[in-house]
Structures are given as structure tokens and as C-alpha cells.
Amino acid sequence: MIDKRTMLAFVGGFAAIGAIAVALPHSVPAQAQGDARVASPTGEPVLIELFTSQGCSSCPPADKVAAKMAPSPGVVVISRPVTYWDRLGWKDTLAKEANTELQQAYARRGLSGQNGVYTPQAVVNGRFGTVGSRELEVRRGVAHNSGAGNAAIRVNDLGANGYGVGLGGDTAKTAELVLIGVTREVEVAIGSGENGGRTVTYTNALRDETRLASWNGGKASHVVTPAQLRVKGANRYALVLREPGGGPVLAARWLN
């Protein structure tokens, strides 16, 4: 049960996003390639999803790019290990079929940049795809493909009651709010396959994702309960507002 004082604090923080369409800044210059920080033109965090695999010899350089970019407050980086290279003999210990299905859905819808199902692939805001090891291209994707959703997520810590989540903005189609649990850093000793004998570190590796609510634009609120933050192996959580079926990402933000 959430007490009245806690809920009032949440509502007060949420009210600030009511005018999101006019409150967002128009532009922020992109950072230089060598700078570890990443800038979004709208000032809202940009989602970068890295489709990677322990069975892909081309993936470790992309995993390093993900680790380099992840600390920036301007992005939400999530590693999504896929299952389709398991057939080569080494079963990826982090792979999820849901990751493979999302990548396939992106390819069916069609991304700008380099579309298709391959690894390593970085997908920016569900709109732009490129080889995940090409850092400059990933950064260009952040600069050119953010803010198109005209939406925002705001979070208010409710202490023992979880987190209050406020949504604001517009959408042309019904979107869904998704809670994603990740492990900040996972070091894996790969026993065989193309990367056999190597130890690779994965950043913000997805453990589980749960659909919280649908959204049709305007102001909306939701509470993420403590029980929803008990995903096995997860020590960080992100919120993603996206059109379903491999549709574009409208907003993303770290919950904690």
C-alpha cells in the first residue's frame, strides 16, 4: 500500500512533464568520437540495443564499444545476446530467444542504416541499425535518430514502495511501457566455438523484460513495485516506451 504522502510526492514530480512537447530543447551538439559521453539532440536518453553473441568472433569489439558508451547519461545501453549462433557448438550462456525475436522483428519492419539479422548489430531507438563495432556510426545514429518519438519518461523514487513512473508526450500508435532487468557487468569465460578460450565482458546484459502498461499518448502514471524488481541476476532496471512488434522506441530511461 502506498501512503498519501508518497503518492503526492510522485504526482508532484510527474506534473512537471505535462508540457513535454514544448519543454524539450531543440538541439544539443554531438560529442566528438573520442569523447566517452554521448549527446541526444532532445536531451532525452537514447536507447542503444546491442545484438551480440558469445559464438560470434566479430562481437567482442562491439561489446567493448557498448562498455565505453554505457556510462554516458545520454544513452541507455542494453546488450541483447541472441540464440542463432548456438548451432555452431557453444551455447551462449546469456542468450534469450526474445532477443532474437526482437532483432528479427526490427529487420521485418526495416531499419534505416544497415538492416538485417546479423551480429554484432547496434540498433538505435528502434530506428537505425549499424555494425556494433563501428563506434562512429553508432554515435551518428544517436545524433540523427533521437527525439523522433516526442515522448518522455520521468521517474520518482518512492522508497520502500518502489518507483513512480510518469509518461508524457504524443504517439501515433499504441505503445507499450516495458521494464527491463539487466546485469551491469557479466564476465564470461567462453569454452569453445569462435571465441573459445577468451573471456568477454558484457555490459547491461538483459536478464528479463516485462510489459507494464499500454500508452496512447498524454499524461499517464504507473508504479513499479519492489516485487517487480526481483529479477534473478539483475542489478539494474530500465524503462522503455516502444511501439510493439519491433516498432520504434519513443523514450527510454534508467530506473535506478
Which residue stretches match the model-derived regions?
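Active-site-proximal cofactor/substrate-binding loop regions of enzyme domains
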Residues: 2-111
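Short loop/turn motifs enriched for small/polar and acidic residues
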Residues: 80-83, 125, 158
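Ligand-binding face of N-terminal immunoglobulin V-set domains in extracellular IgSF glycoproteins
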Residues: 122
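Short, conserved sequence motifs used for protein processing/export or organelle targeting and
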Residues: 93-115, 127-256
